[in-house]
């Protein structure tokens, strides 16, 4: 007998193989062994996989359940005839009524690839045989439920077309019935005030929200100047352009009258400087400092209190006396 050479599994393949092997049920194997031996009358042996590997016992099993399912059973020791027996068994149980997802593949049994699936297929086959009336002393497999066909007349079928299940939804709960059109103004009332309910659908409870509170009604355009008043002075605003001091003010400190940025400013202390009594002329310009800043006459008077006499003396008389004997010879 020849065998296929297959090396050990590593990595993910080994992990998957070990996981499949862990699902193998030893008790189910013992029950299947007793059931197959009772139906066929043939011994499987101690090794369940090697006893079913050639496919001979499996072909005899399906022929007992459904006579004539496998016409020819190969008893050769070669690999290909044994694989042919397993393939014939798979076709026979599928024709017997087995579902495709319950059937194992030939390599699962022949190469010991997935004996858990082989075990699942044989248990399902035992349950299908029990459903079809093939009973044994070994209770294995689950009997399938019998199909029950019901027939309804045309009147009941038409009546059922007008009834929909809750899986399709319902129109008996919350809906938008009675809602006003989009954008329509709705009047509000408070149920806590024990007032009567509204007469129409345009009035809703405060629990639904309100559009009567804070708004931008009466607000000025951006950039418009607003007058300010102080609520503590019990002043009343004249119009919507007057706001409280809590909103800020532009009436207090400012930079009005400040000199050009970077220029020096004349400083004096009014405690030590007296106010001027007469006007003062500063270098030909009155009221203007040398640095261009605006200063008063009192500032200049405070800087030079002793040199000021009210006027400047005239050192050069404007009228000259020319006598007869005075002159210039050219």
Swiss-Prot record:
GO terms for cellular component: actin cytoskeleton; cytosol. Residues 26-130 form the Calponin-homology (CH) domain. The keyword Chaperone does not apply. Residues 279-330 are annotated as: Disordered. It holds the Pfam family CH. It comes from the Eukaryota. One of its GO terms (biological process) is actomyosin structure organization. SMART domains: CH. One of its GO terms (molecular function) is actin binding. InterPro entries: Calponin-like, Calponin/LIMCH1, Calponin_repeat, CH_dom, CH_dom_sf, SM22_calponin. The modification N6-methyllysine is found at residue 158. Residues 306-318 have a biased composition (Basic and acidic residues). The keyword Metal-binding does not apply. Signal peptide: none annotated. Keywords: Acetylation, Actin-binding, Calmodulin-binding, Methylation, Repeat. Calponin-like repeats lie at residues 164-189, 204-229, 243-268. The modification N6-acetyllysine is found at residue 23. PANTHER family: CALPONIN, MUSCLE-SPECIFIC PROTEIN 20. Thin filament-associated protein that is implicated in the regulation and modulation of smooth muscle contraction. It is capable of binding to actin, calmodulin and tropomyosin. The interaction of calponin with actin inhibits the actomyosin Mg-ATPase activity. Belongs to the calponin family. This is Calponin-3. It comes from Mus musculus.
């Amino acid at each position: 007998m020849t065998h296929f050479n297959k090396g050990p599994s590593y990595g993910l393949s080994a992990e998957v193989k070990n996981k499949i092997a862990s699902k193998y049920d030893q008790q189910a194997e013992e029950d299947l062994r007793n059931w197959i031996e009772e139906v066929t009358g043939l011994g499987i042996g101690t090794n369940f996989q090697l006893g079913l590997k050639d496919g001979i016992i499996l072909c005899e099993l399906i022929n007992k359940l459904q006579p004539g399912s496998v016409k020819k059973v190969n008893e050769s020791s070669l690999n290909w005839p044994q694989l042919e027996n397993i393939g014939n068994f798979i076709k026979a149980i599928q024709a017997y009524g087995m579902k495709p997802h319950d059937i194992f593949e030939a390599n699962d049994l022949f190469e010991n690839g997935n004996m858990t699936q082989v075990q699942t297929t044989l248990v399902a086959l035992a349950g299908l045989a029990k459903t079809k009336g093939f009973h044994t002393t070994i209770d294995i497999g689950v009997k399938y439920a019998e199909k029950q066909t019901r027939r309804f007349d045309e009147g009941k079928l038409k009546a059922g077309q007008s009834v929909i299940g809750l899986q399709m939804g319902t129109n008996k709960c919350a809906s938008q019935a009675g809602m006003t059109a989009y954008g329509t103004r709705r009047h509000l009332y408070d149920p806590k005030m024990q007032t009567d309910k509204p007469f129409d659908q345009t009035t809703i409870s405060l629990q639904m929200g309100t559009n009567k509170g804070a708004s931008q009604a009466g607000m000025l355009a951006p950039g418009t100047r607003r007058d300010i008043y102080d609520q503590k002075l019990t002043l009343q605003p004249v119009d919507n352009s007057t706001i409280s001091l809590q909103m800020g003010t532009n009436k207090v400190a400012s930079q009005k009258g400040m000199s050009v940025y970077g220029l020096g400013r004349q400083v004096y202390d009014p405690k030590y400087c007296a106010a001027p009594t007469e006007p003062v002329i500063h270098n030909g310009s009155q009221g203007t400092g040398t640095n261009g800043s605006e200063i008063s006459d009192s500032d200049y008077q405070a800087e030079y209190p002793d040199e000021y006499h009210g006027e400047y003396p005239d050192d050069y008389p404007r009228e000259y006396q020319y006598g007869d004997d005075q002159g210039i010879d050219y």
